Amino acid sequence: MKIKYFMFVLFVWCLLVNGSSYCIAEEKKKGETVVHGVMIVTMDAPLRATIGRKVNVEVIIGNERATKVTTILTVTCPTTKQQIGREAETLDGLSSQKIVYSWNTEGLKEGTYVIRAEVEKVPGETDVNDNVRQLEIALVR
């Protein structure tokens, strides 16, 4: 009975998180344990910005483990091959931290630019789908 209850709770949790029952079937199929680590919780920047002004890119990273971890956060603009920021971050267990970088748009042309944030996986981490986020910013005059 306990296993059925656990599967039901897992199903409901997956449904709430993913909007479908996909994860239960996927976990059964894999037959391996998912090991969480670090993640990009949110990433925020204006959808539109003026060329020549600095644009703040806010990233919240999280630690899904109960123990302290250190990872490297890198924020880039793949469109221009610019590195906006990169630094090591140490997070206490089950915690998050906000990091804000300033992107210099001086000399860029009008258009849409991709901004990408990535945290390096920590030892033993197998769930890396949440380690990367990106967004687009339209630069105008």
Task: Indicate residue ranges for each PLM-predicted region.
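Bacterial N-terminal signal peptides
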Residues: V9-N18
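Positively charged n-region of N-terminal signal peptides that target proteins for export
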Residues: M1-Y5
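Extracellular/luminal regions of secreted and cell-surface proteins that mediate adhesion/ECM remodeling
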Residues: C23-R141
